[in-house]
Amino acid sequence: MTKKMDIQTMILTLQKFWGDKGCMLMQAYDVEKGAGTMSPYTFLRAIGPEPWNAAYVEPSRRPADGRYGENPNRLFQHHQFQVVMKPSPENIQEYYLDSLAALGINPLEHDIRFVEDNWENPSMGCAGVGWEVWLDGMEVSQFTYFQVVGGLEVSPVTSEITYGVERLASYIQDVNSVFDLEWGDGVLYGDIFKEPEYEHSKYAFEVSNQEMLLKFFDAYEKEAWRLMDLGLVHPAYDYILKCSHTFNLLDARGAVSVTERAGYMSRIRKMAHKVARAFVAERKKLGFPLLQHQTEVE
């Protein structure tokens, strides 16, 4: 019996595939975030005129989705393999199908459907035209053309492909629980992540200090605005990410009402809009160096 591809090999295969397509292989960004899109390697780089092609694995924390390690498919933290290409290649969909083939999934032998699912992240001022990708009845990826990021129109067109690492691995390894997945060298996903899942869920739902988190949000927000006033875009963006994660912890704990929730999201959105404009202004001051690099390469 042929050994099924483990997660480690799956990630290495995707890295090799997208690296060969011209993507820089970035590393996960070291601030908590709810999705790979929120990494500065996507959020900031999607705006402005400069080209950008990158691929990376991003651990994504969603406190409200924690299930104490007892649910086979819902997790406090999951992993996304993120691909962002700007400008978007005309044959990006073909690239995606070829990437599945590289993982041993022949598109001609499987039911692969692109189901319309336009994307929106209101708290970060983002929207796009998108599709869920279903593989034999299971959603394994999200495919998006960004229209607006940080309240700014995206030009040139930027495409994003997000692979759900655990979901795709579950399909490839044919297991019903993510905790039974082989990460690599015989070590199971549950051996690494089951205990953290339980502890983070307990923290998010039961023991997080709400008063402290409320103070943290206010402090992070104040610092983000201060840094933007000083023209320090990247440190400011880190604090916006911290605001977002702190809000998600408060939301999971039930510490914010429906009305308050809208208010917090509005506060994050205002910062996201500001930092997006500041990033483009900063790159313009530098003469949009990646545009010059593209011209030199051509």
Curated annotation (Swiss-Prot):
Coiled coil: none annotated. It comes from the Bacteria. InterPro entries: aa-tRNA-synth_II/BPL/LPL, Gly-tRNA-synth_heterodimer, Gly-tRNA_ligase_asu. Signal peptide: none annotated. GO terms for cellular component: cytosol. The keyword Nucleotidyltransferase does not apply. It is found in: Cytoplasm. One of its GO terms (molecular function) is ATP binding. GO terms for biological process: glycyl-tRNA aminoacylation. Keywords: Aminoacyl-tRNA synthetase, ATP-binding, Cytoplasm, Ligase, Nucleotide-binding, Protein biosynthesis. It catalyses: tRNA(Gly) + glycine + ATP = glycyl-tRNA(Gly) + AMP + diphosphate. Tetramer of two alpha and two beta subunits. PANTHER family: GLYCINE--TRNA LIGASE, CHLOROPLASTIC_MITOCHONDRIAL 2, GLYCYL-TRNA SYNTHETASE. This is Glycine--tRNA ligase alpha subunit. It comes from Lacticaseibacillus paracasei (strain ATCC 334 / BCRC 17002 / CCUG 31169 / CIP 107868 / KCTC 3260 / NRRL B-441) (Lactobacillus paracasei).
